[in-house]
């Protein structure tokens, strides 16, 4: 019993201790589980971050691989396209080679067949000669008789097919070129505006065509069955090799090969001619840049020789000259880059479109040069005459003349390029637009071109006559003293003192682009002495009438054709020392007492400038030739004579050739250039008026002289200006290359009210605004038209302060607030009427109403 009680007590005691230990154990296990779970969660988080990083890497690698695969696909596709194009080109070339090979084989067979025919005929003739007798037997190498169609053929047994084929090309090229040259001669436009009578074919082209001429003769002699007998030869070949089943098909195939070969040869010939014309244009531009660079050298010589020269003498050269030189230099570089790297379809029209564009201002500066040129010529005449250097004067006149003719030369060259350009060519439309722009420009400024050329020609002729007179005087004195104690070198010294050299005694001008100008002061002294000695030996002393007749021999006849346009490259050095080439001069040089109503100009019929661009010239235009050039001019030019030639006859003998008597005569018209843009190098003053604008002061003076029955005498400087019948002029910038509308038509000219009746009537008649093509002027306006052109340019002789004072409008000037005395009042007496009016009525002068 005690034992059972003890066991029960132990059992009762045990449950008391077990729960606490169990709880403790459970807590320990729970903490272990918690730490393990935390570590597991941390590990899981690290694993998840690693997976995210790997996923990003996989995505980036996938994108890069996709891009690379896409690039590879694109490159593969591009390579496939290029490969297909190359294969197609190879196939086309292969087919062409097969055609050419067939043609060569055909030609070789024909050659062999004809050689057999020739040998058979020779054998027959030898047999016939042997039968007739040994006397009639021909030599072994003799040609057949006249009846044989192959009398000029001496064909060997066999020949290379390549020789046959290449020998045919020069023949066809030259025959086509010969046709184009005949078109050149027949088309009077191509005789052109570049220098009087200058042929568009150049010495280079002539020299290049000489070998082709010999090749043509040989090809005609030795290859008579050439290109022009291909249909017949094709028929013979077909008859020889055709089968009985399909004869027509083989004949058609042979004729198709003939036509395809002819087309290929014609295309190559046209491209070669176009490249030749482009090379001529490049050579012309190169020589022209050399010429105008000589003007800058002369200008630097003048300015550097005397640093104290006044500003008026420094304006011997137009202010726009340096800008024009830069433009032509840029054009030369562009042409060299294009022409020397000439592709199959070379383009030149974009260069001239850029040159003649409104934003480029090249044509504006060219017009400025044409307007400044009369002033510069007068200054050259005065300043250089004072210094006594006639060599430089002759060179300056020659170089000035080259620049005047450059725009017409461009028209000639572009027409030649356009003539050998197909309508499908990318340059065809560009050249057509350039030709149209140049025609419009030349037609608008025809009078400026004509007046400058006439003035330069007359100055050159006067210089030549004065130089000849000095030469004859020197020769006469040398011959008179020859018997006494004159040294052998006296004649050379006399010739040198006279300022005349051999090239100055020949012709008034060289051709504008035929060669570099004959700058006499650049010649070697030894060569000058040889030429002068030969002149002295060729001339003997005689009467003055004989000298005059001898001098006329050197003048150029009007109908003489000028030499070719360009010289070869090896002749450039000789051209500097060669004589001056000639240009056709005007048909008249009237004396001061000759009435201008009798003056006539030579006219030519209207030629075909360009068959593809006839529509650009107005229908009412005729072709007028001045200086050997042909330009469109309004028809009334030769139909309107002077109505009052007495105004030009009684000229003041006391007036000098200085600029003092012509610089007061022109009032300024400011509205003409109101919309003209300003340029940094703009040489034109704001007061530059158009050839059609009126000179109010001079017309008023002429009207008053007519009202009082007296003719106002003109100064000698006005007599030097070329007297030509009046033409319908236009405003200086009436045209626009962007549109043909009169968008730049000048505003209405403001004028001060005239106190006299005739002056008011004249001002009222001139006050109406002008249209794009002005109306025909009245007879009173035609009388003083050419004088106005000269006086307009001569106003630039005034000092700079006077020209600046002219920049205000007439309506803003107070006519009575001008200064009295000084430079202005000293010449006030020149404008008073000569009717003995003691009050001395004032009238409109260049500075307003006095």
Swiss-Prot record:
Domain of life the protein comes from: Eukaryota
Lineage: Eukaryota, Metazoa, Chordata, Craniata, Vertebrata
Low complexity: compositionally biased ranges: 130-149, 510-520, 754-770
InterPro entries assigned: ARHGEF33, DBL_dom_sf, DH_dom
Presence of the UniProt keyword Coiled coil in the record: yes
Stated name of the protein: Rho guanine nucleotide exchange factor 33
Residues with the Omega-N-methylarginine modification: 766
Stretches with biased composition (Basic residues): 826-835
Keyword match Nucleotidyltransferase: no
PANTHER family for the chain: RHO GUANINE NUCLEOTIDE EXCHANGE FACTOR 33
UniProt domain DH: residue ranges: 273-448
Biased composition (Polar residues): 164-175, 773-783
Organism (species): Mus musculus
Alphabetical UniProt keywords: Coiled coil, Guanine-nucleotide releasing factor, Methylation
